[in-house]
Amino acid sequence: MANEDDDGEKSRSLHQQIARKPKTQIVIGVPSYQEVLESSQTKSTPPSLFKPSQSFSQAFAFVKSSDVYSPPPPSSAAASSSQPSGASQVPHSSSQTHQTDGASSSSTPVATGSVPSNTTQNRNAILVSHRQKGNPLLKHIRNVKWVFSDIIPDYVLGQNSCALYLSLRYHLLHPDYLYFRIRELQKNFKLSVVLCHVDVEDTVKPLLEVTKTALLHDCTLLCAWSMTECARYLETIKVYENKPADLIQGQMDTDYLSRLNHSLTSIRHVNKSDVVTLGSTFGSLAHIIDASMEDLARCPGIGERKVKRLYDTFHEPFKRATSSYPSVVEPPIPEAPVEKDVNSEEPVEEDEDFVEDSRKRKKKEPEPEKTVKTALSAVFARYSDRLSKKKEKQKEKDTTTASDAETHQN
């Protein structure tokens, strides 16, 4: 009972103390809309614990302090530069070395990366001179890139090939233009192409002049009759810049039988079976060449025509024996009409000299070598002789007819 009374007294005393304390006012502040926006905007991001290094050497600097790391051998240039200086040089701090290494490593890729990009673009593209601005040919170059550049020729198609564009219409106005343009090249290119656009109707004289100029200056002439054809030439030369010459080179077999077959089948009427027969009979090409016509005729399947072809091919001289003077062709001689007398019953006599000459011409006897002057003089002399003989015979006939008429009148 005593304990319960004590607890009741304590609780009463606590209630009395709480009641005696002054009551404090609690105020809750509500922020405005602007204060909320400002607080959200000025909210700072939490600091990140990741600190990236400035260079590759700084990022992997801990490798040098490990036991596994071994320094690389010094280069020849570094060794030569370090020998005269000796030990007087003061080593820089590790931070400075790292910074210099980082600067050099970061700067070199930029410099080396920018140059190859330009060079590769120029290598894969046709370099066009600024002189060709406005040329409609450039619109037709579609399969290959082209770039304007400060170059001497009109087009640079590779390291050793270039092209000069020429219009025949422009050549007629300026005949010396091509000569001066070729002279500017100064043989700096192995392949110099003159791309000639034929845009005139009368092409004989201008093409002759362009061909002569190109040949005298070791240039290759390519003629095109349209702008698209000119563009195809430029594209093809650029595409085949680094191609080997296997496409145009003849491929020769290495074995003896195929070479023998290739050489003997070039003779007319000789086939592959004949080559096998000749090879098995004589053994080699030298024995086939030295064989006589009788030996060749003994081979089965080779007739007289093939024997003659083979023998003539192996024994005829390579160079034909031609005369030093050009062969002279005699012009046809006009025949004078022979007047027939209706009253006379005598047959018309033919000129004996004319008949003999015609027979000789039919036989085609070989005449001695003549020059043009001697041949013409001989022809005119014969012609004058024949005319004089015919005139004399005509006069004799006229006199005989006149005398016959007088006798009939008497």
Curated annotation (Swiss-Prot):
Residues 344-355 have a biased composition (Acidic residues). NCBIfam families: rad10 (TIGR00597). It comes from Arabidopsis thaliana. GO terms for molecular function: 5'-flap endonuclease activity; damaged DNA binding. InterPro entries: ERCC1-like_central_dom, ERCC1/RAD10/SWI10, Restrct_endonuc-II-like, RuvA_2-like. The lineage of its organism: Eukaryota, Viridiplantae, Streptophyta, Embryophyta, Tracheophyta. The gene is ERCC1. Its EC number is 3.1.-.-. Residues 76-91 have a biased composition (Low complexity). GO terms for cellular component: nucleus. Seems to be involved in nucleotide excision repair (NER) of damaged DNA (dark repair mechanism). The UVH1/RAD1-ERCC1/RAD10 complex may act as an endonuclease making DNA incision 5' to the lesion site. In vitro, is implicated in double strand breaks (DSBs) repair and is required for homologous recombination in the presence of non-homologous overhangs. In vitro, is involved in chromosomal recombination between tandem repeats in both direct and inverted orientations. May mediate the induction of a DNA-damage sensitive cell-cycle checkpoint during the G2 phase. This is DNA excision repair protein ERCC-1. Keywords: DNA damage, DNA excision, DNA recombination, DNA repair, DNA-binding, Endonuclease, Hydrolase, Nuclease, Nucleus. Belongs to the ERCC1/RAD10/SWI10 family.
